[in-house]
Amino acid sequence: MKTYQVNKEGYYGEFGGAYIPEILHRCVEELQNAYSKVLESEGFKQEFHQLLRDYVGRPSPLYLANRLSKKYGCKIYLKREDLNHTGAHKINNAIGQVLLAKRMGKKRIIAETGAGQHGVATATVCALMNMQCIVYMGKTDVERQHINVEKMKMLGAEVRPVTSGNMTLKDATNEAIRDWCCHPADTYYVIGSTVGPHPYPDMVARLQSVISEEIKKQLKEQEGREYPDYLMACVGGGSNAAGTIYHYIDDERVQIVLAEAGGKGIDTGFSAATIQLGKMGIIHGAKTLVIQNEDGQIEEPYSISAGLDYPGIGPMHANLAKQQRALVLAINDDEAIRAAFELTRLEGIIPALESAHALGALDKMRFKPTDIVVLTVSGRGDKDIETYLKESGTRTSLQ
């Protein structure tokens, strides 16, 4: 049977690996040697699952969205990651990695963040576990996500605004890697998505795989079968998508649909649709698809959503697209906003702008009445209310 899982060297097909400066070799090697042993140990599993249950509030509900289902002519279940503590899927990964860091004897935690959700999740877990926390965040994102910045500070984290480049997620990641190079002995870098050098893409996917583990059980209870016909998720770096599909990745009965950020349109030069626009390259230690110009320089990505404007893509998803295991759709800003308003009006759920891209993909699909669709709402929309308010003037007529 064809498998889409990672191999021992950290590759998904031709994508992945660890392309890193020499100064980080020891850190990454130490992590490669530790992560599998720790993640598979009984002590870790017990502590991780107890925190997911008692602190995060898992399992997150699998909610049959009746009015949305009626609109699209199929059965749509929403996997409600927006109901987790801190309001998104990011907390699953943050808890796992900080537990790993403690077991590795690290004292200082650093993280990058775009929308601020991963930053808040990491700061939250560091407060819980009494660890020093430094979060790198592009100045553009600091301005558009200031509520999350204040939350991180309140939680005791130091937020360092990054003023290089486009001042967004890519630049924050660059700064976090620089910090790690300078403090290799005592610092653990908590990457928030399925990006970066091996073992990060695999480790983050494993920690997020609790999502698909729960979907299997919940579908069995509600539909009498463990698998849906379609799994849908938004993809920036790819961690909520990886968690959503993890236990279904080799099950060809399930059609995987990934929604990436089309921005102002994939032909406009203002986009973050990496799978459609990217060419093979290396970004943040991984060989994957990267949005770049003729000279191989990484282009600045654009999306209305701070969590999706990354010019790379997790190697798992690059491989799924290459092997045609996943259908990838570019959803532009307007389509995402329309979908966010639609979910709010039909189901009383305000989604994050990132999740709204997955919802925007519903309109591009043709479902049968018997189809079972599971769509992951990766986060709640509180952080995006100002953007929605700006847009709402033109949309008040939406029924």
From Swiss-Prot:
This is Tryptophan synthase beta chain. Pathway: Amino-acid biosynthesis; L-tryptophan biosynthesis; L-tryptophan from chorismate: step 5/5. HAMAP family: Trp_synth_beta. One of its GO terms (cellular component) is cytoplasm. Belongs to the TrpB family. One of its GO terms (molecular function) is tryptophan synthase activity. Disulfide bonds: none annotated. Its cofactor is pyridoxal 5'-phosphate. The modification N6-(pyridoxal phosphate)lysine is found at K90. It holds the Pfam family PALP. It is an enzyme of class 4 (lyase). It comes from the Bacteria. The keyword Ribosomal protein does not apply. Its EC number is 4.2.1.20. CDD domains: Trp-synth_B. InterPro entries: Trp_synth_b_CS, Trp_synth_beta, Trp_synth_beta/beta-like, TrpB-like_PALP, TrpB-like_PALP_sf. It catalyses: (1S,2R)-1-C-(indol-3-yl)glycerol 3-phosphate + L-serine = D-glyceraldehyde 3-phosphate + L-tryptophan + H2O. Keywords: Amino-acid biosynthesis, Aromatic amino acid biosynthesis, Lyase, Pyridoxal phosphate, Tryptophan biosynthesis.
